[in-house]
C-alpha cells in the first residue's frame, strides 16, 4: 500500500489510473470502514482511502484533539483489506491557508436533524468532502463509497454531487452492526462496559418506532414523542427520534407508504452521543 501525504504525491500516484474507488475516513477504523473498503474494491481500477480528522466539522464545544488517532492500526487494517493507496494529508497539506471558501448545503436538508443540534456541521463535512473529491477524483471522476449509518451525511453528499454535476458515482454501504444490533461506530470506544450494554436501546427504539408507525392508523409526531420519552426514561438524553421520507429527509406523514421511510435517532448516553437509523 502506497501512502501519499501531499496532494502532489497523491496525484502522481493516481496518474496511471482511470477510475479510482474512494473511501474517505477520519481514521480510528472499525469493521464498518473495512466493509466499505471491500465494497469499493471491484468498483474501480485503484482503491483509495483517506484518513483526515477534519477540524471544520467539529463544533466549539466538541474536542477535536480528543478524537482517537490510531494510525498504525488503521494502516495495518487497510493493508490487510487490499487498499492500494492511502491519502493521509496533514492539516497544512489540505488547508495550506485558512479555509474561508466553504460549501453551504441546502438548508432544507442540512439544517435539520444533525444540522439542528450541530449547527455548521454539514458546512464542514461538505467542504472537506468536496476538497477530497477534488484531490482524489478531480482529474478522472470515479466512485466514492459512504456508509448508510451517517444517513443525512450521505444525502448531503449525494445532493452536492448531483447539483454540482461532479463526475462521481456515490455508492452506499449498509450499516455494520455488532451481534446485539448496535451500529459500529468510532464513538463506541468511549462507552463504559455498562454503557455499551445499554447502548443497544437506541436501535431497539428505532425498531419499535418503525413497527408502531407501520401499525398505526394515523402515525405522526405522537409516536415520535413516545419513543423520545421511553428513551429518556432509561437515562438517555435524546436529540431526536423521528420518521422521515427517504427521498428528502422531510417529516413523514400518514400518506407516506412503508418502503419509502427511514427512522433516525440521535441521543447521548452519559457523555457519548450515538446516531443510528432504520429504513422501513
UniProtKB/Swiss-Prot annotation:
Membrane-crossing residue ranges in chain numbering: none
Involved pathway(s): Cofactor biosynthesis; (R)-pantothenate biosynthesis; (R)-pantothenate from (R)-pantoate and beta-alanine: step 1/1
GO cellular component: cytosol
Catalytic EC class: ligase
Active site: 33 (proton donor)
Keyword Nucleotide-binding: yes
EC number(s) from the headed UniProt entry: 6.3.2.1
Pfam families: Pantoate_ligase (PF02569)
Binding-site residues for ATP, renumbered to this chain: 26-33, 147-150, 184-187
Keywords in alphabetical order: ATP-binding, Cytoplasm, Ligase, Nucleotide-binding, Pantothenate biosynthesis
Keyword DNA damage appears in the UniProt entry: no
A molecular function GO annotation: ATP binding
Annotated positions binding (R)-pantoate: 57, 153
Location of the protein in the cell: Cytoplasm
Reactions the enzyme catalyzes: (R)-pantoate + beta-alanine + ATP = (R)-pantothenate + AMP + diphosphate + H(+)
Chain's role: Catalyzes the condensation of pantoate with beta-alanine in an ATP-dependent reaction via a pantoyl-adenylate intermediate.
Description of how the protein assembles with itself and partners: Homodimer.
Protein family membership: Belongs to the pantothenate synthetase family.
Something else known: The reaction proceeds by a bi uni uni bi ping pong mechanism.
Name this polypeptide is given: Pantothenate synthetase
Species in which this protein is naturally found: Verminephrobacter eiseniae (strain EF01-2)
Amino acid at each position: 500500500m502506497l501512502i501519499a501525504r501531499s496532494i502532489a504525491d497523491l496525484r502522481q500516484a493516481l496518474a496511471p489510473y482511470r477510475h479510482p474507488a474512494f473511501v474517505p475516513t477520519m481514521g480510528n477504523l472499525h469493521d464498518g470502514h473495512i466493509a466499505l473498503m471491500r465494497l469499493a474494491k471491484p468498483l474501480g481500477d485503484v482503491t483509495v482511502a483517506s484518513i483526515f480528522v477534519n477540524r471544520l466539522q467539529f463544533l466549539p464545544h466538541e474536542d477535536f484533539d480528543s478524537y482517537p488517532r490510531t494510525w498504525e492500526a488503521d494502516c495495518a487494517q487497510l493493508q490487510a483489506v487490499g487498499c492500494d493507496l492511502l491519502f493521509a494529508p496533514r492539516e497544512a497539506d489540505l488547508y495550506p491557508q485558512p479555509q474561508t471558501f466553504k460549501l453551504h448545503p441546502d438548508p432544507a436538508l442540512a439544517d435539520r436533524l444533525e444540522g439542528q443540534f450541530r449547527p455548521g456541521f454539514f458546512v464542514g463535512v461538505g467542504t472537506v468532502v468536496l476538497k477530497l473529491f477534488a484531490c482524489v477524483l478531480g482529474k478522472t471522476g470515479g466512485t466514492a463509497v459512504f456508509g448508510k449509518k451517517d444517513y443525512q451525511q450521505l444525502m448531503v453528499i449525494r445532493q452536492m454531487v448531483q447539483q454540482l454535476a461532479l463526475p462521481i458515482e456515490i455508492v452506499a454501504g449498509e450499516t455494520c452492526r455488532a451481534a446485539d444490533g448496535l451500529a459500529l461506530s468510532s464513538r463506541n470506544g468511549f462507552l463504559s462496559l455498562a454503557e455499551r450494554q445499554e447502548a443497544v436501546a437506541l436501535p431497539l427504539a428505532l425498531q419499535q418506532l418503525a413497527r408502531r408507525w407501520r401499525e398505526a392508523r394515523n402515525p405522526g409526531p405522537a409516536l415520535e414523542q413516545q419513543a423520545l420519552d421511553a428513551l429518556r426514561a432509561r437515562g438517555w438524553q435524546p436529540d431526536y427520534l423521528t420518521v422521515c421520507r427517504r427521498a428528502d429527509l422531510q417529516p413523514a406523514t400518514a400518506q407516506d407508504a412503508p418502503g419509502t421511510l427511514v427512522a433516525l435517532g440521535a441521543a447521548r448516553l452519559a457523555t457519548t452521543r450515538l446516531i443510528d437509523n432504520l429504513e422501513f
